[in-house]
């Protein structure tokens, strides 16, 4: 089985975008907020949004399952307040659940959290628990910077985040570190802010005792880990200068990296630097980079093709990257797959 651990619902129906526009337009007058019940999307309309996109690419590229979540840029936690974020997150998560119900062999859900700048993360616990226990989701996307590029909140190592981490450990789900849209003009969203968020989270983990407090807490850092693999020597050296244990001991029981890296040399670097046991296959198809690479004639985000070309990866290595590591990191995934096989 080929498991893609990083997929977003980027082909949403127009009705969802219209609802969001009405929600934002009502920020100054809460009495005008649209009711979630006003959003009408049929199952056939949902099918139409993925049949020609995510499902098409699954079939063409030979992948089997996508761990699927709402559009990352669309989370936009900096817009509105916590009540706006909650309604928006619930709606987006419910659409993911419906798609996973229609296509149980193709998609398994990961939830958007109703974060809001300056608001205690424990307010996200109920939505996380709902999505995991009621919808069968296997993880969450966690935004380290709900302010949208201004980094106004506590670092991820701060005890402020602990109520959320406690629930993640209790129900055995990991979080993918994923910022959302940038409202800071200095930081392009997908070219800078995403990679900055990945790199920042890693360094916050490195300089903390977080995994002493939560030895089973797990994070996936997407987009190949931001700058981390390229500067692995820097991070090893910083840890050494701080009299910390080696990174393998300090972080790599808890921190994992995906393969959303869009050229072969980048994947080669990732697989040379990061232990195979810490790499999860992912493509983020129909995501940040959607075009065809003129140098190869293939889509940039067809990342399976790159992994297949890495000559030093054994068949066992590739099995770990494509399947085994996702089954290990997403603690609820095996049981969820068994249920979908029986019902699909």
Where are these regions (language model features)?
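Proline-centered flexible-loop/turn and helix-kink motifs
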Residues: 104-105, 136, 163, 212-216, ...
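Glycine-enriched alpha-helix->loop->beta-strand junction motifs that scaffold or abut catalytic
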Residues: 135-138, 169-174, 190, 214-217, ...
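Structural motif corresponding to alpha-helix initiation and N-cap regions
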Residues: 48-52, 121, 125, 158, ...
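Active-site gating/metal-coordination segments in enzymes
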Residues: 64-201
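Aromatic-lined glycan-binding groove of carbohydrate-active enzymes
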Residues: 4, 206-250
